[in-house]
Each structure stands twice: as C-alpha cells, then as structure tokens.
C-alpha cells in the first residue's frame, strides 16, 4: 500500500507555541516519524509545507520529501480575514472585562489558526499536484 504523509506548519517551541522557550530540536522527532511510517508501509511519499524556513535543510535531509515548500509566514498576511469578517467587530468591548491581554491573545490565536489551516491545505495541495504530474 502506498502512503502519503503530509507535514505542515511551524516548528514548535520548547515551552509552547510560537517558539516560546526556544525552538525544539526536531531531528529526533522527524527520524522517529519517518522510521515509523517507513517500517510499517512499503512505499511512503513525504510532502512538506512549513513556515520554518530556517529548518528547511534539516527537514528535507531527514524526510527526503517528494515535494516541499518553505516560506515566511508573512506571505498569508494579505489573505487573512479580519475579526470583523467573523462577526467579532465588538471584540473591543471585552477589554473592560479581560484587559488588553485578552485581545492580544485572541489576535495571535486567530492568526495562528488561519496559518495552521493554510499550511495544512498547502501540504495537501503539493501532494495532489505531485500525484497528478
């Protein structure tokens, strides 16, 4: 059975998202994941879309993907929807209750969610493009 494994997103931080506590060393994780799939399936193709441009060589060397895209996260800025597009035009009214930290956290979470799903869709898109070529 042939298997396609799609990796996407940004390398996580040691103490949370967005590189908090410094970025993780993903070498061991990549090797374990690759070994798991390669040992279980005879024919595995890897595809990668990642915001971790600085990890491009490492990821490509370990996974040897059929296709990969590494790009800065800022490429999606013009595609992001605003809070108002999701009916959250009154988010400022929550400041009195939760303070500015809530709004800042919400904006970061909102950007993260859109980035995640964009990257997920790009990894599937490059897999599809490869399979159609």
Predicted features along the sequence, with ranges:
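ER/Golgi luminal nucleotide-sugar-dependent glycosyltransferases, focusing on the catalytic module
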Residues: 1-133
